[in-house]
C-alpha cells in the first residue's frame, strides 16, 4: 500500500499559528495545510484558526469523519480527518465580532489502478500484418499524473494518458518473424514525484505472441495418377517458405481414406511422405488432398487419382503336356477393355483375346508362350504379362552335333568324352565296347590304347530307344612321327603346284595379248573359269 501523506507536527503548527493570526481589523479564517495529498483511505490533521482573539464560533464543515484533537487555543482548533476516499475540500469557518469568514483546504487522494489488463492477443498473427494492442485500466488517481504504456518486452511502444473510466489505450504495430514468442504487456505509471513522493508502477500479465508465415503458393503434390487395386503407391507433399515450420501440420487423404504421413522438416520447408494402398471398393476416380495448416490458415492442393482393377491375362493351353505331333491351341484372354498380344503369333486385330494352333514338335518342349495385355487408364498405358510353358513328350535322340561319331585323341592326353542324348522324358545313356567296356561320358580320362575301339551308345526312355556307334582312335607317338612329315610334305607340294599353275596361266595370257596386238585383233575379255 502507498505510504501515508505528511502529517503536520504539533510544534510546527503552534509556531505557524502566530504567523497566520492577523491583528485587529477585518475578520479572516486560515487553514493549514492548504493542500494535502494522501493515499486513499488515509487520514490527515488540519488546523483551523481565526483572526480575532475571541471568536464567537470556530469550526470545520466536511462530510469526512472528523474529530477535534489537542486542547486548542482561543482562536484555533485542530481536527483529524480519517478514511479519506476521494478528493475533498473541508472548510474552516470563524465568526468574529467584526464579521464571518471561511477557508478551504484541498485534499487530493492518490491510489494506483485496481486493474491493468492487456487484451488477449490473437492465437496466431500473420507476418507482415499490423497488430493492435489494447490495454484497459480501471481506477487510479490522480489521473493527471497517470500514464499508460504498451510494451514489447521492456521496449516502450506507446505512452498515453489515462482518460475515461475505465481508460482504454490502443496502438498498432507491424509484426515480423522476429516477433514470434515476444512478450507484450501494459504498464501504468503514477508519477507523484512532484509531490515529493515516488513513481508507482503497475504492470499487466504478459501475453506471448505467436506469428506465422504461410506462403500463398499451394503445396506441391507428387503421386501416381493411376493406382491398381491391392497395390501400394507413394504420395509426397511438400511446401517451402514456412515459419515457424515446426508448428506446421500436414493432412493427407485419398477420398475418405486418411493417410499417415512421415514428415521431414527443413529450415523453412517440410516434406510429408505416405504410403497408400487401395481396395476394390475405391475403384474409380478419387480425390487426393494435401493440406498444410499453419496458424489459422491452410493451403491445399488436390489431385485426381484413378483407381483401376487389371488382372493378369490368362494363357491357356489345350494341354500343358502333349506328345510329339499333337495339335495344341494356345489362347490368351484379358480384361474386356484390354488389348493382348501373343508372342510368336502372326499379327491379329487388337482385342482382349488371341489364339493360334500349334503342332507340337520336340523343339517346342519347354517353349514359353507369353501374353502381354495393355490397358489404357486415365490416358496412361498399363501392362500385364502372363507366361505358360509347353512340355512335349518325344522319344530319345542321338545326333552328330551332340554325340560325335568319331574321336581321334593322342595317347596319354587328357580328354573328356561328350555325348548328349535328348528326349522327354530325358533318356538314360550308356556307351559300351563289346557290350561290356563303358565309355566314361562326361568324365575326364587319360587316353590309353585300351580306350580305342567302337562303342555302341544307347539312349532309352519310356518312349523308346535309339542307338549310335561312336569310334575312338588313339594316336601313338610313332604314328605321329610318321604322319607329321607326310602331312607337311603334302602341304609343301600342294603349295608349289598352285604357284606353278598361276605362273603358267599368267604367262599364257601375256603371250595371247601380244599375238592379238600384232594381228590387230581387238582383245576380248577372258571368261575362262578358274580351275578348282
From Swiss-Prot:
InterPro entries: ICAM, ICAM1_3_5_D2, ICAM_N, ICAM_VCAM, ICAM_VCAM_N, Ig-like_dom_sf, Ig-like_fold, Ig_sub
Residues with PTM Phosphothreonine: 521, 530
Compartments, record wording: Membrane
Record-linked SUPFAM superfamilies: Immunoglobulin (SSF48726)
Polar residues bias locations: 515-532
Disulfide bonds: 48-92, 52-96, 135-186, 237-290, 332-371, 403-419, 419-457, 431-457
Chief subcellular location: membrane
One term under GO cellular component: plasma membrane
CDD domains: IgI_N_ICAM-1 (cd20996)
Signal peptide per UniProt: 1-27
Changes after translation: Monoubiquitinated, which is promoted by MARCH9 and leads to endocytosis.
Positions annotated as glycosylated: 47, 130, 145, 183, 202, 267, 296, 316, 385, 406
Region of interest (Disordered), residue spans: 513-532
Stretches assigned to the Ig-like C2-type domain: 41-103, 128-193, 230-297, 325-378, 412-464
Alphabetical keyword list: Cell adhesion, Disulfide bond, Glycoprotein, Immunoglobulin domain, Membrane, Phosphoprotein, Repeat, Signal, Transmembrane, Transmembrane helix, Ubl conjugation
Segments on the Extracellular side according to the record's topology features: 28-480
Top-rank taxon, per record: Eukaryota
Gene Ontology terms for molecular function: integrin binding
Gene Ontology BP, a term: cell adhesion
Membrane topology category: Single-pass type I membrane protein
Record Pfam families: ICAM1_3_5_D2, ICAM_N, Ig_2
TM helices/strands, residue ranges: 481-503
Family: Belongs to the immunoglobulin superfamily. ICAM family.
Subunit structure: Homodimer. Interacts with MUC1 and promotes cell aggregation in epithelial cells. Interacts with ARHGEF26/SGEF. Interacts (on T cell side) with CD81, CD247 and CD9 at immunological synapses between antigen-presenting cells and T cells.
Function: ICAM proteins are ligands for the leukocyte adhesion protein LFA-1 (integrin alpha-L/beta-2). During leukocyte trans-endothelial migration, ICAM1 engagement promotes the assembly of endothelial apical cups through ARHGEF26/SGEF and RHOG activation.
Name under which the protein is recorded: Intercellular adhesion molecule 1
